[in-house]
Amino acid sequence: MTPRKTLRDYIRTIPDFPHEGIMFRDVTTLFADPRGFRIAVDQLLDPFVDVKIDKVAGLEARGFILGGAVAHQLSVGFVPIRKKGKLPGKTIAQDYVLEYGKATVEIHDDAFQPGERVLLVDDLLATGGTARAGIQLIERLGAEVVGCAFLIDLPDLGGRKLLEEMDMGVHALTSFDGD
């Protein structure tokens, strides 16, 4: 009998990508496997089944894949949070700090109505900078982030702590500590 795969078994680790010393967690192998992908989407939803959610927001780019699937399961709308300059029409922007500089994410200025309840989804929680910027955009439009769901948490990088200090609920399916 073949041992049952865990979610981590579906995630490929690629050493020294995109830079030497980085252990890249490649979730495309999980997305390519129908069973693994289904398990991931179901588990991302699990803590939120009894929570009223009006929309799901996904962070570029793999958060679009996960967030779209989660929104479909919930029968709610999906809102992409994109890198600067990628959305047509009127947008609002939020800068965030990277290790060596800064970046910007945007959403359409009419993406949320005041009072809407939003679940933020992405594949990876590292430093939390991108997620925090996404939360700030959602809140600037008057919506409420009811939680954040990630496939992977890299706790050594402090993202969970950052989001929890914002009183944000964080749900991650697996973590990779210093490996």
UniProtKB/Swiss-Prot annotation:
Keywords: Cytoplasm, Glycosyltransferase, Purine salvage, Transferase. The keyword Mitochondrion does not apply. Its main location: cytoplasm. The keyword Phosphoprotein does not apply. SUPFAM superfamilies: PRTase-like. Its EC number is 2.4.2.7. Belongs to the purine/pyrimidine phosphoribosyltransferase family. One of its GO terms (cellular component) is cytoplasm. This is Adenine phosphoribosyltransferase. GO terms for biological process: adenine salvage; AMP salvage; purine ribonucleoside salvage. It is found in: Cytoplasm. Pathway: Purine metabolism; AMP biosynthesis via salvage pathway; AMP from adenine: step 1/1. Homodimer. It catalyses: AMP + diphosphate = 5-phospho-alpha-D-ribose 1-diphosphate + adenine. It comes from Dinoroseobacter shibae (strain DSM 16493 / NCIMB 14021 / DFL 12). Catalyzes a salvage reaction resulting in the formation of AMP, that is energically less costly than de novo synthesis. PROSITE patterns: PUR_PYR_PR_TRANSFER. One of its GO terms (molecular function) is AMP binding.
